[in-house]
Amino acid sequence: PTKQPEVVSQPKVEKEVIALEMIHFEFDKYRLLPETKTILENNAEMLKAHPKVKVIIEGHCDERGTIEYNLALGEKRALSAKNYLVDLGISADRISTISYGKERPLDPRSNEEAWAKNRRDEFKIVE
């Protein structure tokens, strides 16, 4: 009788999920507040621990203002986060930015609570 080849199953390698916390902004501003800097410092530590990971910073605004104005403001918000991460030692070539202005609200309502949620930067991991 011929011997059947032994089937060896490869161990499954769990891919580590890397999540970076979003930051929020004041109305019509792109400056980083102390609490947003703390979040960015934590995000920088995560990026340092995963040096092959790249990130896209998405700048978002609330619904007030024109499309053009909010696209520009969203880009300034994304760039302010990028510049701070670079200052913290993250290579600029690992970070790209995009602005969605007011096109992708987290909360579609028209009130201060919703607007505060929508004024944000989100961090999308690219590997």
Residue ranges and their predicted role:
Residues P1-K54:
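Periplasmic peptidoglycan-binding/tethering modules of Gram-negative envelope proteins
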Residues E58-E127:
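Periplasmic OmpA-like peptidoglycan-binding domain that tethers envelope proteins to the cell wall
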